[in-house]
């Protein structure tokens, strides 16, 4: 959520920055609501002061032995008017808040202006895509050769965009997540967390999934509605529970940065992606990811973004997977991000790079929703923290990249050296 004072006092400047990311802010409506808020605020305060004054008069009149009934009736009437004014003000404030919850974050000045993914800017490349002297098999073909990917079984169990992994392919999938966690915790300074896969609506509001992206989530619903039944949703990313661990907290600044990681399944409805990536593991309703989250001082967040992106890059480098780093343009950034780097790994069967990690600085956008603050050691004043999140990495897509980049002419899959300790020294699948 943007700073309400910024929306209130500098709506034109905010609108100009939001226009860079293709969002039209209704400045006239905001101004009208703000003028109405001021009127209602003054009216409410005046009624409160008048009621307090009249209430004191009752005691004074009673002490003088005067008839207090007219004053009592007047105070009661003022009370009714005050309650009505407060209710009207609360309704207006709720309307303003609802609008604020739909406004995306402001882009950082250095983010390239653009409409969509076609306007993203490549920053760098690492590694050289392998040249094959045989016909490339895609990961689906390789997985079926080794009885490791069973999409038909998943359709029977659940439906499309799910998979059953088996044997050494399932083992490599597990090895990848363990390798990523060990790297981030042992070398990059993150603490490992195990978090719930179901979260409540307050948690989803905190990180910005609600109210705007309710349709992208899988929501729980009792077979028979009960008055006390809780509303939960499956997490779309571990960013949601990890970041919300600091919700409503005041953290001493000398405790920052807080760096957390978790390996979880992620659940997404993939609304709007009909017909895209229907074959294989690239776009699933359920997929595993190792997530990185940092909670930092505001002045440290841009440096933290560079560091976090480097941590994700290290995973790819140790796996020997060619990739490119791009900075997303204003029109392609996520709702809460002010700046985002994507890492795209080389997928031989598609002869292109595909997203495997997204690392974002969110500034104080989530912290304001969560009321997550830090306290200065010198003057004890509090301020909102900055939050960052990044994939380190998407496990299923990493599996795709390993299977395809390490395939052999006979269909075997070489196991990258860094994964062999997690697979009992196995060198090849098949």
From Swiss-Prot:
It is an enzyme of class 6 (ligase). Keywords: Aminoacyl-tRNA synthetase, ATP-binding, Cytoplasm, Ligase, Nucleotide-binding, Protein biosynthesis. One of its GO terms (molecular function) is serine-tRNA ligase activity. Pathway: Aminoacyl-tRNA biosynthesis; selenocysteinyl-tRNA(Sec) biosynthesis; L-seryl-tRNA(Sec) from L-serine and tRNA(Sec): step 1/1. GO terms for cellular component: cytoplasm. It catalyses: tRNA(Ser) + L-serine + ATP = L-seryl-tRNA(Ser) + AMP + diphosphate + H(+); tRNA(Sec) + L-serine + ATP = L-seryl-tRNA(Sec) + AMP + diphosphate + H(+). Its main location: cytoplasm. InterPro entries: aa-tRNA-synt_IIb, aa-tRNA-synth_II, aa-tRNA-synth_II/BPL/LPL, Ser-tRNA-ligase_type_1, Ser-tRNA-synth_1_N, SerRS_1_N_sf, SerRS_core, tRNA-bd_arm. It holds the Pfam family tRNA-synt_2b. L-serine binds at residues 237-239, 291, 391. ATP binds at residues 268-270, 355-358. It is found in: Cytoplasm. It comes from the Bacteria. Its EC number is 6.1.1.11. One of its GO terms (biological process) is seryl-tRNA aminoacylation. Catalyzes the attachment of serine to tRNA(Ser). Is also able to aminoacylate tRNA(Sec) with serine, to form the misacylated tRNA L-seryl-tRNA(Sec), which will be further converted into selenocysteinyl-tRNA(Sec). PANTHER family: SERINE--TRNA LIGASE (PTHR43697:SF1), SERYL-TRNA SYNTHETASE (PTHR43697). Homodimer. The tRNA molecule binds across the dimer. Consists of two distinct domains, a catalytic core and a N-terminal extension that is involved in tRNA binding. This is Serine--tRNA ligase.
């Amino acid at each position: 959520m943007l700073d309400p004072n910024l929306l209130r006092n500098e709506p034109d400047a905010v609108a100009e920055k939001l226009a860079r990311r293709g969002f039209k802010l209704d400045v006239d409506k905001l101004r009208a609501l703000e003028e109405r808020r001021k009127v209602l605020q003054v009216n409410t305060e005046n009624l409160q002061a008048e009621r307090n004054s009249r209430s004191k008069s009752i005691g004074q009149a009673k002490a003088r032995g005067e008839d207090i009934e007219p004053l009592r009736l007047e105070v009661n009437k003022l009370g009714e008017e005050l309650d009505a004014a407060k209710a009207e003000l609360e309704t207006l404030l709720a309307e303003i808040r609802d609008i604020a919850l739909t406004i995306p974050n402001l882009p950082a000045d250095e983010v390239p202006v653009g409409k969509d993914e076609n306007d993203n800017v490549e920053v760098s490349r690492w590694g050289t895509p392998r040249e094959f002297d045989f016909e490339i098999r895609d990961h689906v073909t390789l997985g079926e050769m080794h009885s490791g990917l069973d999409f038909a079984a998943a359709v029977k169990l659940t439906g499309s965009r799910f998979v059953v992994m088996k044997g050494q392919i399932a083992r490599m999938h597990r090895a990848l997540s363990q390798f990523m966690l060990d790297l981030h915790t042992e070398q990059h300074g993150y603490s490992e967390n195990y978090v719930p896969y179901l979260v409540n609506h307050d948690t989803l509001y905190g990180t910005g999934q609600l109210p705007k992206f309710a349709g992208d989530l899988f929501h729980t619903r009792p077979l028979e509605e009960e008055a006390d039944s809780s509303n939960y949703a499956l997490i779309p990313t571990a960013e949601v529970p990890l970041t919300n661990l600091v919700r409503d907290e005041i953290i001493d600044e000398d405790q920052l940065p807080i760096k957390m990681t978790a390996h979880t399944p992620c659940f997404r409805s993939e609304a709007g992606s009909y017909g895209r990536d229907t074959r294989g593991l690239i776009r699933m309703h359920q997929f595993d990811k190792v997530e990185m989250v940092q909670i930092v001082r505001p002045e440290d967040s841009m440096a933290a973004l560079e560091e976090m992106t480097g941590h994700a890059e290290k995973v790819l480098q140790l796996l020997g997977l060619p990739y490119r780093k791009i900075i997303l343009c204003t029109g392609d950034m996520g709702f809460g991000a002010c700046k985002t780097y994507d890492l795209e790994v080389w997928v031989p069967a598609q002869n292109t790079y595909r997203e495997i990690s997204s690392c974002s600085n969110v500034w104080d956008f989530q912290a304001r929703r969560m009321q997550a603050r830090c306290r200065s050691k010198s003057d004890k004043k509090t301020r909102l923290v900055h939050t960052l999140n990044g994939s380190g990495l998407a496990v299923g897509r990493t599996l795709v990249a390993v299977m395809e980049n390490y395939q052999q002419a006979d269909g075997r899959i070489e196991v990258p050296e860094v994964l062999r300790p997690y697979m009992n020294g196995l060198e090849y699948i098949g």
